[in-house]
């Protein structure tokens, strides 16, 4: 006789299979029949449409009035150069959401994505070919880079540009692909449960796990409108997270780490108050804290490890959610 249920089984297992730096499989199980696809499909849509990334939105090239122009001594036409630029993936540093960056090149040279990296921007596709300059030729240009989601057509930003700029179609999403498959999984001799496997590939601006985490946050934010009118009981996992030893340690003040005055002041001036804020940061985020030198960086990493955590390390999702609520409440 089939067991009668009053509530569907909630999945308990979560796994991440890191395939490469920019590709991962994210698995969760066991789901009741039909539940896996009900969650996987909207998550995939959020991954592709709502992941925040950077893209060039406009370019100004010395000596060029439009995208069908050319530059003396450059092998590529302006239109080809722009196409190559769109294939280049940018990441602004220091938390900036928009920047205008100037570049000057003199031939002969082969310009690649790596040549555009500087103190303001990181190129996460360094091997992208941009242009080839002949001897005695020069290429001077400015790029406007912005942060956004999805796709924005050049017509939508044209009116905001200064004279001389060429508007570009902007592809912001850092997620190159997101696919899923559903498999059956055995639970207590019952094969009618499901496992969802999400395959996520990014361009290097963010990790697949961060992209997945961001898509969950967007989904939760979209559902929050219902909770504003209808009181929904928090899942037991969140309630347990509020009482977990991890959360208590992560919400301790940074002075609990016993840092030197210089390291402490760097964090404090950047408004980093809790140990958990450091644990949630990536290594690049921590390195980009204003006036934080290598010695201070190494000290913070070491002290955090002594506390039981890693910079950019994995924390349980329920702990991350509870921790972010604590940080937002500061």
Curated annotation (Swiss-Prot):
The segment annotated Alpha C-terminal domain (alpha-CTD) runs over 244-330
Top EC category = transferase
Q: Which reaction does it catalyse?
A: RNA(n) + a ribonucleoside 5'-triphosphate = RNA(n+1) + diphosphate
One Pfam entry for this protein is: RNA_pol_A_bac
Q: Does the keyword Transmembrane helix apply?
A: no
Q: Map out region (Alpha N-terminal domain (alpha-NTD)) in residue numbers.
A: 1-230
Keyword Nucleotidyltransferase among record annotations: yes
GO biological process terms on file: DNA-templated transcription
Q: Which family does it belong to?
A: Belongs to the RNA polymerase alpha chain family.
NCBIfam families (alphabetical):
PRK05182.2-3 (NF003517), PRK05182.2-5 (NF003519), rpoA (TIGR02027)
Free-text comment about domains: The N-terminal domain is essential for RNAP assembly and basal transcription, whereas the C-terminal domain is involved in interaction with transcriptional regulators and with upstream promoter elements.
Alphabetized HAMAP family for the sequence: RNApol_bact_RpoA
The name this protein carries in UniProt is DNA-directed RNA polymerase subunit alpha
Q: Which organism is it from?
A: Sulfurimonas denitrificans (strain ATCC 33889 / DSM 1251)
């Amino acid at each position: 006789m089939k067991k009668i249920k009053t509530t569907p089984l909630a999945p308990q297992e979560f796994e991440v299979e890191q395939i490469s730096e920019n590709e991962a499989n994210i698995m969760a199980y066991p789901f009741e029949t039909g539940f896996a696809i009900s969650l996987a499909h909207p998550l995939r849509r959020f991954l592709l449409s709502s992941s925040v990334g950077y893209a060039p939105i406009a370019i100004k090239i010395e000596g060029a009035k439009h995208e069908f122009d050319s530059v003396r001594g450059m092998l590529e036409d302006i239109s080809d150069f722009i196409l190559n630029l769109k294939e280049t993936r940018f990441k602004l540093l220091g938390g900036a959401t928009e920047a205008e960056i100037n570049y000057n090149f003199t031939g002969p040279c082969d310009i690649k994505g790596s040549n555009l990296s500087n103190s303001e921007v990181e190129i996460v596709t360094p091997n992208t070919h941009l242009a080839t300059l002949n001897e005695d030729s020069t290429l001077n240009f400015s790029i406007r880079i912005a942060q956004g989601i999805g796709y924005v057509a050049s017509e939508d930003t044209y009116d905001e540009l200064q004279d001389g700029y060429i508007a570009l179609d902007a592809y912001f999403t850092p997620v190159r692909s997101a696919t899923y498959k559903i498999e059956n999984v055995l639970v207590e001799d019952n094969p009618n449960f499901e496992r969802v496997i999400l395959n996520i590939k990014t361009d290097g601006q963010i990790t697949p796990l961060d992209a997945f985490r961001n898509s969950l946050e967007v989904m939760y934010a979209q559902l929050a409108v219902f909770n504003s009118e209808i009181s929904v009981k928090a899942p037991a996992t969140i309630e347990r997270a509020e009482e977990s030893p991890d959360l208590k340690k992560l919400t301790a003040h940074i002075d609990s780490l016993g840092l030197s005055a210089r390291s402490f002041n760097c964090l404090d001036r950047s408004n980093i108050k809790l140990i958990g804020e450091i644990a949630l940061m990536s290594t690049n985020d921590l390195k980009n804290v204003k006036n934080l030198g290598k010695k201070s960086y190494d000290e913070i990493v070491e002290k955090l490890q002594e506390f039981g955590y890693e910079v950019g390390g994995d924390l349980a999702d329920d702990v991350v959610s509870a921790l972010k609520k604590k940080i937002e409440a500061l």
